[in-house]
């Protein structure tokens, strides 16, 4: 198998539906066209400016971005986004505005320990919400209130609210 020096070679894959990236050095996506791309999984922070890839995706998975604090740059151009999975983002303290994503109906959060502001949920179009190991400093009541404030919520799963399960009983009471 030959080593590819540039990501431009991907432009030949017009039907490429799913792309998973974990690059060791930033690259330029300016000359890459992937009209069939719908699923994008980004791991790590050396993927370059992936804005050109975001316009057609419907599923975005962001993972292990240790220094990333603001997710707006990933979400604002992703106007067709339907499902979002945020995983192991230790610097994220608040969710960005979700009201500009009218097709976003499912959000899964995992290991966002510093998350302390979930107010964006109340202005979202979400129907499904799942979270595990988030908002270590949020009380059980604050977490439950944020979930209950999602206007069109049909299903929610809060598993392992924290590693010690100290908030689990409080969340159960709040939902009762």
Indicate residue ranges for each PLM-predicted region.
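Concave beta-strand-loop units of leucine-rich repeat
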Residues: 1-8, 15-50, 54-76, 80-93, ...
């Amino acid at each position: 198998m030959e080593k590819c020096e540039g990501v431009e070679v991907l432009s030949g894959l017009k039907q490429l539906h799913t792309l998973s990236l974990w690059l060791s050095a930033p690259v330029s996506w300016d000359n890459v066209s992937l009209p069939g791309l719908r699923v994008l999984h980004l791991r790590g922070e050396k993927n370059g400016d992936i804005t050109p890839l975001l316009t057609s995706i419907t599923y975005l998975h962001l993972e292990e971005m240790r220094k990333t604090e603001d997710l707006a740059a990933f979400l604002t151009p992703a106007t067709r986004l339907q499902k979002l999975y945020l995983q192991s983002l230790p610097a994220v303290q608040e969710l960005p505005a979700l009201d500009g994503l009218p097709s976003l109906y499912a959000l899964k959060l995992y290991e966002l320990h510093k998350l302390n502001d979930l107010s964006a949920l109340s202005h979202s179009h979400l129907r499904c919400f799942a979270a595990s190991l988030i908002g270590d400093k949020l009380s059980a009541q604050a977490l439950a209130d944020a979930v209950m404030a999602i206007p069109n919520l049909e299903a929610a799963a809060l598993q392992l609210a924290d590693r010690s399960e100290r908030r689990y009983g409080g969340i159960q009471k709040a939902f009762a």
